[in-house]
Regions:
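A short SAM/SAH-binding and catalytic strip from SAM-dependent methyltransferases
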Residues: 105-118
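Short glycine-centered segments of the SAM/dcSAM-binding site in methyltransferase folds
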Residues: 39, 60, 133-135
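A short glycine-rich, Lys/Arg-flanked "PGG" loop and its adjoining helix->strand segment in the class I
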Residues: 120-132
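Residues lining the SAM
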Residues: 64, 110-113, 139
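A short acidic, Gly/Pro-enriched loop at the edge of an enzyme's catalytic core
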Residues: 95-107
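Class I SAM-dependent methyltransferase SAM/SAH-binding core
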Residues: 41-97
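C-terminal alpha-helical "lid/dimerization" subdomain adjacent to the S-adenosyl-L-methionine
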Residues: 13-19, 135-203
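Conserved class I S-adenosyl-L-methionine
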Residues: 1-36, 50, 73, 80-81, ...
Length: 208
């Protein structure tokens, strides 16, 4: 539930998550020509770990996360200088809040979409928020058997909607939203309870 993310926020940034953020940022940098002018929107940004890793390679950063606890940690990082002073921290929930007016050259969402039961409105919002040449980068679990979130209270209503994604199926959902997508598998392994779970990177551009 959302409150469980609030509770976890203060101790969220452990070594494994920092390493994951670094691997994700490097995979994105390898797949997308990053520019210091690019406006970055990270959805489900948590404490801003991925944005921290990308900050020196992109322009102004906007972080969105529905968890107040996560936003508080992200805002503390801005105050402390680990994220640029111009960084904005939003509580926007694209599934319910409507689409922001702002436009972005780069939208990143990491380990977030598997929490979203109703993807089409969120993918449509991404399409609207992205500039014509912009890139949407999705990093998530490759389809798994449900064990990744077993016992984390994720099944209770909010939270866990998908046991990861078959990247091809996600690409089809993205096509419905007007995107062309290329997928890179196994950009990083997340280890949990002694098992390794691969992450994929999907990079999408809007169809002209």
């Amino acid at each position: 539930t959302m409150s469980s993310f609030d509770d976890k926020a203060a101790t969220w940034d452990d070594e494994a998550k920092i390493e994951r953020a670094r691997a994700v940022a490097d995979a994105i940098a390898g797949a997308v020509p990053l520019e210091p002018s690019m406006r970055l929107f990270e959805y489900g940004a948590g404490t801003g770990l991925v944005a921290e890793q990308l900050a020196s390679r992109v322009g102004p950063i906007t972080l969105a996360d529905p968890s107040a606890g996560m936003r508080e940690v992200a805002s503390e990082k801005v105050a402390a200088g680990s994220l640029p002073p111009t960084t904005r921290v939003w509580g926007t929930d694209l599934a319910t809040d409507g689409v922001p007016e702002d436009r972005f050259e780069l939208i990143v969402t990491v380990m977030t979409l598997h929490h979203i039961a109703d993807l089409p409105p969120v993918l449509a919002a991404f399409a609207e928020m992205l500039t014509d040449e912009g890139r949407l980068c999705i990093v998530d679990l490759e389809a798994e058997d449900g064990s990744f979130h077993a016992g984390s209270g994720h099944d209770a209503g909010v939270g866990h909607a998908h046991d990861g994604f078959e990247p091809d199926q996600l690409a089809a959902r993205l096509a419905d939203a007007g995107f062309t997508t290329s997928v890179e598998r196994s950009i990083h392994q997340v280890t949990k309870d002694g098992r390794a779970y691969p992450l994929f990177l999907a990079v999408s551009v809007k169809q002209p």
